[in-house]
Structure formats: C-alpha cells, structure tokens
Amino acid sequence: MNAYSYMLIKNPDVNFEGITINGYVDLPGRIVQDQKNARSHAVTWDTKVKKQLLDTLNGIVEYDTTFDNYYETMVEAINTGDGETLKEGITDLRGEIQQNQKYAQQLIEELTKLRDSIGHDVRAFGSNKELLQSILKNQGADVDADQKRLEEVLGSVNYYKQLESDGFNVMKGAILGLPIIGGIIVGVARDNLGKLEPLLAELRQTVDYKVTLNRVVGVAYSNINEIDKALDDAINALTYMSTQWHDLDSQYSGVLGHIENAAQKADQNKFKFLKPNLNAAKDSWKTLRTDAVTLKEGIKELKVETVTPQK
C-alpha cells in the first residue's frame, strides 16, 4: 500500500496535449481530476492515517508490560484474599482496555472514511479509463496488446509484493525451520521484483503517445485500486482486534461480579477460584498482542515522512 501511494503522489498529471477526444470534450478534465483525487487520498494515507495506524499498533505492543504488572498485582491479591486491591486493579485495567478499544474504533472510522472515498473515486476512475481506451482504440491506437502486457506486468508486481509479505509472516513462525523457509520466499519475491523493474521502465517509455497515455492512466488507476483493496484488509484486521478488546473487557467484567459474591466469605482462599478466569483473560490479551505484532510486522517498511505531491 505504501508503494502504491508513493507512486500516486510522485506521478505528474496526465497530459492530453495533442489528443483529440471528439464527443467527450470533458473526459480529459475528468481523468485529470480522477488522478488528483487519487493523489489526495494517497497524501491523506501517507501524512495522517498511516501514523494513526502505527501509533495504535505500537500502543498495543508496548502495553504488554503494563498488562503483566496488573496481572501480577491481581494474582497477589487473590493469594492474600485482598478483595479491594483485586477490584481496584481490575477496574483500572478495564478502563485502559476500554480506552484502547476506543482508539481502535476511531482508527477503523478513519480507515473506513478513506476507503469509502477511494471506492467512489475508483469506480469513477475505472469508468473514465475504459472510455478513454475505447476512444483511443477507435482512433487507431494499438492499445489492446499493450494493455494486456501492462496488466500482466502489474499483476506480476502485485503477486510478488504479496509473496514478499507472506514470506515475512512465515519468518515469524515458531516452528523449527519456518524462518529459513520464510527467508527463501522473501528472497525469491525480491529477486523477481528486481527483474520486473526493467519491464516497468520499458512500459513507461514513449512509443506511441496515445498508447503511452493509456499506460499512464492505467497505472494510476491500478495503484488507487490496490490501495482500496489494502484498506479493506486493514479494516477487517482492526475490526477483529476491536472485538478482541471488547471480549477482554467482558471477561474482566465477569470477574468483578464474582468478586462481589466471594467477598462475603471469611476464607482467605475465597478468590482462588478466579485464577482460571484471570489466566483465560491473560491468554486473550496475549493473542491480541500477537495479532498487533503481526500486523505491525506486515507494515514495518512504512515510514511516516513529509511528502510533496506533484502539481
């Protein structure tokens, strides 16, 4: 996603000089506006939403020590029969869990807003792109064969980018040998991406101006379309994590209810039966953190930087 946004930001507006679009005088302006809209969305991702995503994931990952401290305090309170400390610890922890869920939900809303805007523009851009191709073809431009080649190269680039990402995920596997296998996958992906670069450069060269125009518009559309797909994946992952926060809060809410009932007993071990509940909640937290680490690893190449879009 970062690579696609970078290309959109850096690419200049398509130039229709010398191209006659009979019957569709407004089409060049619409396509230029499509490209500007796509670039604007890419800038929003690069300067705002990306940082918010990284901050949210970092917050989850770094919360691990705080969670462990809460857990140890609550276990000690159970062992000593200290109901007040146990209630206070769980209440404070629930407050922080609810705050983290709120952050995740805010991020989901930002991503959804961006995705919805991009989705609208993708449909408009796609329609205008198809119309342009039809017009150029009718004017004698050999766009069919060139378009097929363009789609093949872009498809290969997307495939190896995904393969590279999958390889990093395999490298994090705990099973013996998986890091080596993941390293091989990443190596293969990068090797093939390197081989595709000359082909992409060749496709950017001017052979026939009408064909080149079709290429520029096609690549811009492909980039914004891939960002749209990537946002869907990010929203799904964060929605799942938000649900995990909610489930974790519910687990501790249940523990609080048990404390009230058990507090009436005189037995010092009256809270011991809550240990399995705490352990289950801890397991849920570890799963949530692992998911955050995995998502963070998947986008670790993202760097929040100042970008200067082309005019």
Swiss-Prot record:
It comes from Edwardsiella tarda. The keyword Heme does not apply. It is a single-pass membrane protein. This is Uncharacterized 34.8 kDa protein in hlyA 3'region. CDD domains: ClyA_HblB-like (cd22653). Pfam families: Bacillus_HBL. Its main location: membrane. The keyword Thylakoid does not apply. Keywords: Cell membrane, Membrane, Transmembrane, Transmembrane helix. The chain crosses the membrane at residues 168-188. Gene3D superfamilies: 1.20.1170.10. It is found in: Cell membrane. The lineage of its organism: Bacteria, Pseudomonadati, Pseudomonadota, Gammaproteobacteria, Enterobacterales. One of its GO terms (cellular component) is plasma membrane.
